[in-house]
């Protein structure tokens, strides 16, 4: 069984390796990607195509959207927004219009970052799953931390007011980022993934079914795969979270079942709250967006 100390050392070493990578940042204002950037004749925000180097030198892409006009004296509060499985994310108009700078980040091999790097074989959740050092989510988690590096270094951003927000896979990435980076001041995780792998591995509903099928087809690799996944399981990272966390769950969600989420939530030691919907499955509720924005306003304003 992997100890908490082993997990902490693994991530400390991984963070140290990321810190050695020059971001080689490029930014280009791309107004055509945000057709609603003007309200009437008034420009309300600017969106930049942002490309940077992350863990092991892999290039990743993001949209950086910032309100127009002079920032407040201490800078804009900022939110790192991370995607569901596959990298689908809308531009965060609902956040920027309320005065947040937002980095909409696509981890390696997802969404916009497919232009820079692609998985050679298999799927993300089982990519090198038996090798903790080469597993897909080692790089993906560090891509999120690189996003925090970006925001904390922006002159128009208040580095003391950075949050992370995500749904589904993005919920898992939000929890992981909050656990691995103390610069995160608030986190929102809607129906998070990457939780409680020993239970999740029995699910036959996509995308956890990718893991289930792999372990069924390769039973001789199960022990090694589960030992590797322990380093990436929110169940083992949750106790490292120090910021306020809002979690969303759903009783009839078969994609990310509540039985995978609740044990993680229970291990979070910081201030926390959970919203559980009794009558919805794996879907984004509009009212959860209101709860999430109120959470960010409370801790980032």
Language-model region placement:
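C-terminal catalytic histidine-bearing segment of alpha/beta-hydrolase fold enzymes
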Residues: 3, 262-301
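Short beta-strand/loop motif that positions the catalytic acidic residue
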Residues: 241, 247-249
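Conserved alpha/beta-hydrolase "acid-adjacent" motif
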Residues: 254-260
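Short glycine-enriched nucleophile-adjacent loop
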Residues: 151-152, 164-165, 171-182, 187, ...
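N-terminal cap/lid segment of alpha/beta-hydrolase-fold proteins
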Residues: 21-73
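Cap/lid segment of the alpha/beta-hydrolase catalytic domain
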Residues: 90-96, 101-142, 199
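Hydrolase active-site cap/lid region
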Residues: 175-221, 276, 284
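Gly/Ser-rich "nucleophile elbow"/oxyanion-hole loop immediately N-terminal to the catalytic nucleophile
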Residues: 125-168
């Amino acid at each position: 069984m992997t100890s908490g100390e082993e997990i902490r050392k693994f991530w400390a070493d991984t963070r140290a390796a990321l810190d050695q990578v020059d971001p080689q940042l490029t930014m280009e204002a791309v107004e055509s990607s945000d057709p609603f950037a003007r309200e009437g004749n008034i420009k309300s925000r600017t969106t930049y195509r942002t490309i940077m180097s992350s863990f092991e030198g892999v290039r990743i892409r993001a949209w950086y959207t910032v309100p127009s006009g002079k920032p407040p004296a201490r800078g804009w509060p900022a939110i790192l927004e991370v995607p569901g499985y596959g990298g689908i994310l809308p531009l965060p108009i609902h956040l920027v219009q309320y005065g947040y700078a937002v980095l909409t980040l696509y981890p390696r091999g997802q969404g916009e970052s497919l232009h820079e790097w692609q998985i050679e074989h298999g799927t993300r959740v089982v990519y090198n799953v038996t090798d903790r050092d080469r597993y897909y989510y080692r790089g993906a988690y560090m891509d999120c931390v690189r996003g925090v590096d970006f925001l904390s270094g922006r002159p128009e951003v208040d580095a003391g007011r950075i949050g992370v927000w995500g749904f589904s896979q993005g919920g898992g990435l939000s929890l992981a980022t909050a656990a691995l980076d103390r610069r995160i001041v608030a986190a929102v995780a809607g129906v998070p993934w990457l939780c409680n792998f020993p239970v999740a591995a029995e699910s036959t509903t996509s995308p956890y079914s990718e893991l289930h099928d792999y372990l069924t087809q390769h039973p001789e690799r199960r022990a090694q795969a589960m030992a590797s996944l322990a380093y990436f399981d929110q169940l083992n990272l949750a106790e490292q979270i120090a910021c306020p966390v809002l979690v969303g769950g759903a009783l009839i969600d078969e994609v990310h079942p509540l039985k995978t989420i609740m044990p993680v939530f229970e291990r979070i030691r910081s201030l926390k709250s959970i919203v559980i919907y009794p009558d919805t499955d794996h879907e984004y509720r509009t009212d959860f967006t209101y709860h999430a924005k109120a959470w960010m306003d409370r801790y980032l304003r």
